[in-house]
Every structure is written in structure tokens, then in C-alpha cells.
Amino acid sequence: MSRTVCVTSVDGHTGFLVAELLLTNETFKSNIKSVTGLTLHPHAEKCKELAKLGVKIVPHEPGRLKHTVQTLQQVGAEALCLIPPAHKDKFDITMEMIEAAKQANIANVCFVSSAGCDLAERDKQPHLRSFIDLEAAFMASKGDSSTSTGHSPVVVRYPPPFLMSNFLKWQ
């Protein structure tokens, strides 16, 4: 069964890699009907590259919850890979996207968090620690029968790209 997948923050490193992988890896490609990329920067170079691969690039406009819900419904998103943007308003933008996923009744949502966020101290590393609050808000939908999103939410903690890049250089 092929799925329509929506990936957020495709203008960033992680979002770009996820969308690219879905359309280029044979294991995933055969199970994907289409990929939509939500982005704060639709004219970014990474968005142009993804568009060449077949990703439908859609601008994400924070503060317009109803519009975001409609967008998710219009593209027919059956699965959402929710990646917080590298943005000063990351927390608010992500909270709004969590709510949009619920209202759009997307049954399969994967929240991509940051490895090590549980070890961060709230006072010393507030940006990293905020991922814990976002994870909690996202997982609060689990078991919520008023939305399909409550069926199977999942959190994946991914190492920040710069850490992974540094790690690979030492190999």
C-alpha cells in the first residue's frame, strides 16, 4: 500500500534528508505515492533540489492553524514526519503543527526529536531541553479517541546533524 507522506522542515538538513531518502531509496520508494514538503523557506536551495525529485513544496505559514490543517487535508497526508524547524520560534511553530496533525486526523505521525535532549539542563540548555516539552505535548495525543493521531504516535530521537557529521569525520 503506497502512502502520501508529508515531511516538515524540508529546507533544513534533517527534513531534506528524510524527503530525499523516501524518494530515492528502493525500499521506501516503492511504498510512497507522493511526498509533500512543508517549509518556512520554499525558495531555499534544498527545496529546489527536492522539487526536482518530485517533492511537492508547500509553504508553511506559522500562526495560521486552520490553513495548515486544510493544507494537510488537501495534500492527502496519510503520514507526517514532524521535524521541528531550526527557527527562533521552533517551540510555537512545532506546537501548532502538533495541533494541526490532530485536527487533520493524520493517523501516522513520527516526531523527530533530538538525541540527548533528556540530559540537557533546562536553565543551561533551554533550546535542547525544549524538545522534551515538545515530545510530551506530542505524546499527549496517544490514546485520544477524538483524533486518528492518537492511534500510533512515535518519537524518534535523532542525533543533531552537526554531531553526526563530526562523529563521521573521526571514523
Per-region residue spans from a language model:
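Short beta-strand segments at enzyme active-site cores
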Residues: 110-112
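Oxidoreductase cofactor-interface core, primarily capturing Rossmann-like NAD(P)-dependent enzymes
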Residues: 2-32, 38-45, 65, 86-88, ...
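NAD(P)H-binding glycine-rich loop region in Rossmannoid oxidoreductase-like domains
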Residues: 37-104, 116-121
